Amino acid sequence: MSDLGAVVALLLWGQLFAVDSGNDVTDIADDGCPKPPMIANGYVEHLVRYQCKNYYRLRTEGDGVYTLNNEKQWTNKAVGDKLPECEAVCGKPKNPADAVQRILGGHLDAKGSFPWQAKMVSRHNLTTGATLINEQWLLTTAKNLFLNHSENATAKDIAPTLTLYVGKKQLVEIEKVVLYPNYSQIDIGLIKLKQKVPVNERVMPICLPSKDYAEVGRVGYVSGWGRNANFNFTDHLKYVMLPVADQYDCIKHYEGSTVPEKKTPKSPVGEQPILNEHTFCAGMSKYQEDTCYGDAGSAFAVHDLEKDTWYAAGILSFDKSCGVAEYGVYVKATSIQDWVQKTIAEN
């Protein structure tokens, strides 16, 4: 059984639930757990109930309760001898973000409000963001992955050049990088870790939504390790609160404007913001606070009050605004949901 689960002991209505002994269930008739007394017109059943540690939940079609049968096998009425699994909880930070001021310099995340936020360092020590979506996979942008790589670079070329941190500067090893097939139109890539990361209050994935949360006016939170108001990379995770903007206004804002292209190496994704049906904009041009260089790859996190769960409505793709009256551009999570699930299942 996984060390994320445990077996608990309960004596309830004459039914004995087996003793908790870590990952091993003791013989119920040994000296550590004596046989219960018999009752008239009744009998004793030996039952175990599987439970998960904090920040994990039981995944099973049954109820997690197993009975010892005559063949001395633990079975569940619904799933037989198939054991349940403990899967990581997503989108349930212990200390969720408060409704605070929007600041480019950022509000310090001292409480672990964004446990899905990862820090990625690419070639030549450039800091960018990534977003944990389960225990072993993260989303980031194709632009981030191609930083300081030539347009001919492959995913295999890129993976060894990246350094990734989760939680409080916890270094994790990267197994592979997977680029979205049409990354010139949908600026997204996936990162697979060599090992699953233990989930706790500092490290927790954000949930991917089944519906589109990128509605005009909806407020989301974006955390990151990008440049601050002095254009220096920060050593502390910061966050900003931004509203989803009208797409027409955003497109109109960027019409005719360009971002200087780097001469070498040239990225196959390009430097300009990608605006299409798979993206949305956030930020309002009358404000002078926003995301900045190095924040790309971070989630536009929204709080569903009914479910009390945080979802990634999008992933920040274009982060060049830096408080100069421009919009940030995000890839919609709903546009990549099927690809993400398929890629994870195949790898």
UniProtKB/Swiss-Prot annotation:
Glycans are attached at residues 125, 148, 152, 182, 232. The gene is HP. Expressed by the liver and secreted in plasma. InterPro entries: Haptoglobin, Peptidase_S1_PA, Peptidase_S1_PA_chymotrypsin, Peptidase_S1A, Sushi/SCR/CCP_sf, Sushi_SCR_CCP_dom, Trypsin_dom. The beta chain mediates most of the interactions with both subunits of hemoglobin, while the alpha chain forms the homodimeric interface. Disulfide bonds join 52-86, 90-207, 250-281, 292-322. It is found in: Secreted. Belongs to the peptidase S1 family. It comes from Papio hamadryas. Residues 31-88 form the Sushi domain. One of its GO terms (molecular function) is antioxidant activity. Keywords: Acute phase, Antibiotic, Antimicrobial, Antioxidant, Disulfide bond, Glycoprotein, Hemoglobin-binding, Immunity, Secreted, Serine protease homolog, Signal, Sushi. The keyword Plastid does not apply. It holds the Pfam family Trypsin. This is Haptoglobin. Residues 259-264 are annotated as: Interaction with CD163. Tetramer of two alpha and two beta chains; disulfide-linked. The hemoglobin/haptoglobin complex is composed of a haptoglobin dimer bound to two hemoglobin alpha-beta dimers. Interacts with CD163. Interacts with ERGIC3.
